[in-house]
Amino acid sequence: MSEPIDILIAGAGIGGLSCALALHQAGIGKVTLLESSSEIRPLGVGINIQPAAVEALAELGLGPALAATAIPTHELRYIDQSGATVWSEPRGVEAGNAYPQYSIHRGELQMILLAAVRERLGQQAVRTGLGVERIEERDGRVLIGARDGHGKPQALGADVLVGADGIHSAVRAHLHPDQRPLSHGGITMWRGVTEFDRFLDGKTMIVANDEHWSRLVAYPISARHAAEGKSLVNWVCMVPSAAVGQLDNEADWNRDGRLEDVLPFFADWDLGWFDIRDLLTRNQLILQYPMVDRDPLPHWGRGRITLLGDAAHLMYPMGANGASQAILDGIELAAALARNADVAAALREYEEARRPTANKIILANREREKEEWAAASRPKTEKSAALEAITGSYRNQVERPR
């Protein structure tokens, strides 16, 4: 990139903030993030960052902050509703990667990224309370109509617009006005974070199923709690939506859920060494939403506009890959703009580098979801072999040692 350019990123989530840091590190123009929320707060629950994305964040200078905050996940362990191990596999460094797989609170990761952006790019780099409403390309510029928290219209312009504005992306809607609705996986999820006793080695993710396809996923996400001999546990309870009696496609990541709705599905579980009832009842806030994704796009952007993260490739959480792919999007976008002085061509290079991988993961996550639910009702001996095959196939498709 020879001439300085102005870049607007719609959305100051994990993908948008990572992209801003990568663009700044590459010395590419002036970067401004527009965030529709009036205040960026550490919301959400736990997520996983895969080794490739951890490496990318380390190269942005965030390795020490991650290590001080997150849990390096060592093992993925599948168990039955009695707590007996069905299948397990190593993760992160234990699986031969040079970098760990980190489990971390989404809000804490966002705050790490936000602090780095404000320190390196300046406080003015993140403008809150501005939601994108109108987009137009004219004379080699992207013109954006936004509205602030008081309803006052704002006019902005840039050489590049990056839509990192999430599942209900305004930028994606502009680029793909005929987009299909969210695709429902037929699963309702309840999620929460609970201060809990340490379990197993304090670095293990557990996945438990019963024969009725109710599922629990739980893993620790806080280095601070671990240092105190305890765990901050992220948990997800998944139940077929038909059993819940609702099929809601309106995904809202901050919708409140109710203990009395989720607890009956796990009332007869006895994991022995892990008290699921205690985990759920000690939780302060329960979130509820459907498991959804979007069909892969044949192209992401056009001209001087592109997408990244959930705006480009919303995927099921089965492979714990969504946030990692958003981070890798941002890294590749910065690299493409650094290589190519033609902005539009650089954006297409970025898309060609990232879209096939992201689309493959969308489909692989759908397939893994079907296969794991199908394996739930099998006898234990068959289930072990099935899970070994499922996880091995997934690794071969979407993971690579880092």
Swiss-Prot record:
Pfam families: FAD_binding_3
Binding site for FAD: I14, G15, E35, S36, L43, G44, V45, R106, V132, R191, D310
Enzyme class: oxidoreductase
Entry keyword set: FAD, Flavoprotein, Monooxygenase, NAD, Oxidoreductase
Any one GO molecular-function label of the UniProt entry: monooxygenase activity
Catalytic activity annotation: 5-methyl-phenazine-1-carboxylate + NADH + O2 + 2 H(+) = pyocyanin + CO2 + NAD(+) + H2O
UniProt cofactor(s): FAD
EC number(s) stated in the UniProt entry for this protein: 1.14.13.218
Stretches for region Disordered: 368-402
Pathway: Secondary metabolite biosynthesis; pyocyanine biosynthesis
Top-level taxon of the source organism: Bacteria
Record function comment: Involved in the biosynthesis of pyocyanine, a blue-pigmented phenazine derivative, which plays a role in virulence. Catalyzes the oxidative decarboxylation of 5-methylphenazine-1-carboxylate (5-methyl-PCA) to pyocyanine. Can also act on phenazine-1-carboxylate (PCA), converting it into 1-hydroxyphenazine (1-HP). However, PCA is a poor substrate.
Name of the featured protein: 5-methylphenazine-1-carboxylate 1-monooxygenase
Organism annotation: Pseudomonas aeruginosa (strain ATCC 15692 / DSM 22644 / CIP 104116 / JCM 14847 / LMG 12228 / 1C / PRS 101 / PAO1)
Lineage of the species this protein comes from: Bacteria, Pseudomonadati, Pseudomonadota, Gammaproteobacteria, Pseudomonadales
Name of the gene this protein is made from: phzS
